[in-house]
């Protein structure tokens, strides 16, 4: 099957999904909300409202990876379809509110969401099975560097669940016998040095073999290079993180507006949480901890206290080991599970210590330990620390530090307000994913312990 036909079939399947999920919204609009707007629409206006939902669902479906049939389980697809539909419904509810003279009844919208989840579930089940029946797993080879091994890629990250891994080899072994790739459809290159990688890449391109590259730090930095021409030669200009002033202005404006609105809306949660923490052990409500932000500047990050007052009485900084950490109070377990402990950082954002999106701030002593193992770790301090970030959305709490660093540097290499919004919306999804709050081994001072990166 040609690549064109493959992509065409996938687009048709995704389009069918968007149509199916739009049907419950259209019914809800025509049967209820359309009759209650300030000035009832004629047919074209009704079509426009339905089309707006259709477009929103496609946009948020891409943000939440709701269409990735080949890379996810059916349950994951349904979960992400739910969020794409829910966010689209919420935006449309605001639009309908603006079109009406009063706050519209939300129950028809909830009923539409239930219908959308049913439609999405039917689609996900059938599309997932149809995809793997039409496009069975391809013969795949994993070529790796000794330092980073292929075990993580295949086992920890689940490559073998979606690809038919028929061959593994080091870069040296592959280069000595490139014919081993004959008959292979897909190649994964994991942590390979540029010289070896280029030899393998050239062979794969010449033989129409699809290649996925797990980048090294240098690759990530180069990905943000500015393309230009000098002296009649193509050039790539690479430098320190230095985004356009317009980007920084809009980013700071969004930080102020969003954090201020969020503090007002979430004030009841702040009050209830403060009372619960105080009533548990009569200790302080907030916990202030020194963290690092842009250019290694130190600041005091605020959190609701989730651990005992004497959690670090020995003076040693430790990362949490998750649910098994006996330093966490009963209230702390609840607010950590709901991410409520992070909410006071909205004050840090309003003050300008942090941004909504950026690399998560580390404690100085833990950052120093990371830098001993990975000197490149300091590169993430080019940008202001954030409440959420690329690594938080696309990784897990216990994703290896090297991979988290690569994700953070990928974000830094491509500053974009659009990307910031994508990360903000994607953060909503991970709030309800338990695995994103998993801890590390008990007693570890950093996630580097025992890690061969």
Language-model features: where?
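Membrane-cytosol interface motif
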Residues: 81-85, 137-153, 284-307
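A short, structured surface patch at a secondary-structure boundary
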Residues: 321-384, 423-427, 431
């Amino acid at each position: 099957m040609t690549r064109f036909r493959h992509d065409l079939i996938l687009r048709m399947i995704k389009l069918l999904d968007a149509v199916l999920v739009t049907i419950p919204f259209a019914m809800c609009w025509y049967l209820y909300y359309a009759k209650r707007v300030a000035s009832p629409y004629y047919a074209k206006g009704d079509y426009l409202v339905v089309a707006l939902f259709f477009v929103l669902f496609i946009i948020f479906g891409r943000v939440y990876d709701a269409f990735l049939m080949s890379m996810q389980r059916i349950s994951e697809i349904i979960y992400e379809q739910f969020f794409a539909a829910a966010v689209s419904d919420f935006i449309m509810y605001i639009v309908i509110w603006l079109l009406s003279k009063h706050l519209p009844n939300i129950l028809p919208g909830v009923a539409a969401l239930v219908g959308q989840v049913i439609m999405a579930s039917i689609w996900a089940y059938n599309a997932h099975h149809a995809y793997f029946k039409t496009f069975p797993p391809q013969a795949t080879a994993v070529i790796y560097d000794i330092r980073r091994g292929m075990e993580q890629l295949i086992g920890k990250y689940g490559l073998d669940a979606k690809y038919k891994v028929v061959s593994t080899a080091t870069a040296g072994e592959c280069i000595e016998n490139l014919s081993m790739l004959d008959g292979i459809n897909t190649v994964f290159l994991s942590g390979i040095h540029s010289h070896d990688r280029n030899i393998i890449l050239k062979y794969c391109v010449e033989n129409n073999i699809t290649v996925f590259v797990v980048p090294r730090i240098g690759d990530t930095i180069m990905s943000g290079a500015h393309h230009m021409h000098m002296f009649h030669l193509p050039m790539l200009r690479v430098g320190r993180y230095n985004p356009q002033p317009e980007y920084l202005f809009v980013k700071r404006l969004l930080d102020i507006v969003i954090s201020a609105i969020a503090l007002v809306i979430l004030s009841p949660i702040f009050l209830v949480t403060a009372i619960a923490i105080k009533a548990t052990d009569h200790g302080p409500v907030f916990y202030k901890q020194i963290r690092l932000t842009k250019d290694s500047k130190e600041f005091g990050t605020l959190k609701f206290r989730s651990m005992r007052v004497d959690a670090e009485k020995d003076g040693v900084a430790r990362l949490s080991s998750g649910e098994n950490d006996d330093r966490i109070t009963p209230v702390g377990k609840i607010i950590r599970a709901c991410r409520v402990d992070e909410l006071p950082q909205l004050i840090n954002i309003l003050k300008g210590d942090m941004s909504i999106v950026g690399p998560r701030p580390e404690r100085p002593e833990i950052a120093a330990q990371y830098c001993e193992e990975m000197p490149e770790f300091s590169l993430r301090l080019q940008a202001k620390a954030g409440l959420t970030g690329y690594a938080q959305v696309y990784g897990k709490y216990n994703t290896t530090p090297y991979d988290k660093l690569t994700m953070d540097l990928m974000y830094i290499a491509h500053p974009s307000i659009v990307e910031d919004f994508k990360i903000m919306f994607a953060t909503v999804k991970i709030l309800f994913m338990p695995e994103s709050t998993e801890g590390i081994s008990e007693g570890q001072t950093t996630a580097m312990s025992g890690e061969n990166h």
